[in-house]
Amino acid sequence: MTISREVNQNYGEIIACSVTGKLNAYSGGIANSNYGRIIACWFDGTLKEYESGAIVRYNYNTITSCYWGGNAGQGVFRNHGGTVDATKVDGATVKWQTAVDGMNTALTDNDYQWALGTGGLPVLQKKQ
């Protein structure tokens, strides 16, 4: 799913989500606060740099196989005892294809997978 605005507080599961664009608020690219699980998601864009995280601003639970590009220097602004598996796509050592492979490994028990799209960013598609 592509969402136009991040989630404020996640208490459930966000799986295979992508967000692109510019956020002018102090927030995270996917969610402001994570109390649940975020799995195989990515963000690419511009965040207000101070007190922002590319995936979430505040993490209290689990982030698995998530990736980000853009100006953010960190995947999580503040981690409060949660587990974080989030990687920056820098275009040199980590490319978007690396992100696709990592996110697909985390996607289990569903009919979808990430593929590299024509624009160079991951797109979600039904498994063949």
Regions inferred by a protein language model and the residue ranges of each:
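Predominantly extracellular beta-rich ligand-binding scaffolds that present long acidic/polar faces
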Residues: M1-Q128
